[in-house]
C-alpha cells in the first residue's frame, strides 16, 4: 500500500454522496453492485474509462451530503486507489477510513489535471505528479488511521486484533 501509481480522474467542489453512489442503488449493500454504479451520476461514462488503481482528485468538501457508508465502499470496491481533495466532509472522512479507502488532503489539487499520472507514497506523505514533474505533500494520516487502512478497514482491523487476543 505504500506506493501507488495511477491516472487522475478530476471532479469539482462539493461532490456529494449522491453523486458518488446514487440513492436509487441503496437498496443493496453488495459492494460489487455499488461499485458498478460509482460516480455514474457525476460522469456517466466514468467506469468505461476508469482503471483500477486510478485516483479521484477533487476540490473542497468531497463526500458531503448523507452519512452513508455506501459511498466509500463503492469507491474502494471499484478500485479507486485514493481520493485526493482539498477537504472532505467529516463523516465521509471517517467512513472512508472505516472501510479502508485512503483519502488524502492536498491544497494544490487545482494544479493536478485530468489524465495526469500520480505516484502516491503513503509512508512519505507525498504525491508526485509524474506528468507535470511536481510534488505535493498531503496532510499526515494519524498512525491509528494508517493501521485501519493497512488492515482494510475497521472491521478487518478489529478481527485481526481479536485474533491476536488484543481485543
From Swiss-Prot:
Pathway: Amino-acid biosynthesis; L-leucine biosynthesis; L-leucine from 3-methyl-2-oxobutanoate: step 2/4. The keyword Lyase applies. It comes from the Bacteria. Transmembrane segments: none annotated. GO terms for biological process: L-leucine biosynthetic process. The keyword Amino-acid biosynthesis applies. GO terms for molecular function: 3-isopropylmalate dehydratase activity. Keywords: Amino-acid biosynthesis, Branched-chain amino acid biosynthesis, Leucine biosynthesis, Lyase. Its EC number is 4.2.1.33. InterPro entries: Aconitase/3IPM_dehydase_swvl, AconitaseA/IPMdHydase_ssu_swvl, IPMI_Swivel, LeuD, LeuD_type2/HacB/DmdB. SUPFAM superfamilies: LeuD/IlvD-like. It catalyses: (2R,3S)-3-isopropylmalate = (2S)-2-isopropylmalate. It is an enzyme of class 4 (lyase). CDD domains: IPMI_Swivel. Heterodimer of LeuC and LeuD. Belongs to the LeuD family. LeuD type 2 subfamily. Catalyzes the isomerization between 2-isopropylmalate and 3-isopropylmalate, via the formation of 2-isopropylmaleate. This is 3-isopropylmalate dehydratase small subunit. The lineage of its organism: Bacteria, Pseudomonadati, Campylobacterota, Epsilonproteobacteria, Campylobacterales.
Amino acid at each position: 500500500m505504500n506506493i501507488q501509481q495511477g491516472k487522475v480522474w478530476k471532479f469539482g467542489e462539493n461532490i456529494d454522496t449522491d453523486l458518488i453512489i446514487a440513492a436509487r442503488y441503496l437498496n443493496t449493500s453488495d459492494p460489487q453492485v455499488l461499485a458498478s454504479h460509482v460516480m455514474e451520476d457525476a460522469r456517466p461514462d466514468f467506469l468505461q474509462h476508469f482503471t483500477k488503481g486510478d485516483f479521484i482528485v477533487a476540490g473542497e468538501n468531497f463526500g458531503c451530503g448523507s452519512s452513508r457508508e455506501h459511498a466509500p465502499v463503492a469507491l474502494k470496491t471499484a478500485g479507486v486507489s485514493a481520493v485526493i481533495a482539498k477537504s472532505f466532509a467529516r463523516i465521509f472522512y471517517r467512513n472512508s477510513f472505516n472501510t479502508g479507502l485512503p483519502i488524502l488532503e492536498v491544497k494544490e489539487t487545482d494544479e493536478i489535471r485530468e489524465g495526469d499520472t500520480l505516484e502516491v507514497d503513503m509512508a512519505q506523505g507525498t504525491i508526485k505528479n509524474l506528468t507535470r514533474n511536481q510534488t505535493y505533500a498531503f496532510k499526515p494520516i494519524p498512525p491509528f488511521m494508517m493501521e485501519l487502512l493497512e488492515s482494510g478497514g475497521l472491521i478487518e482491523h478489529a478481527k485481526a486484533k481479536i485474533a491476536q487476543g488484543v481485543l
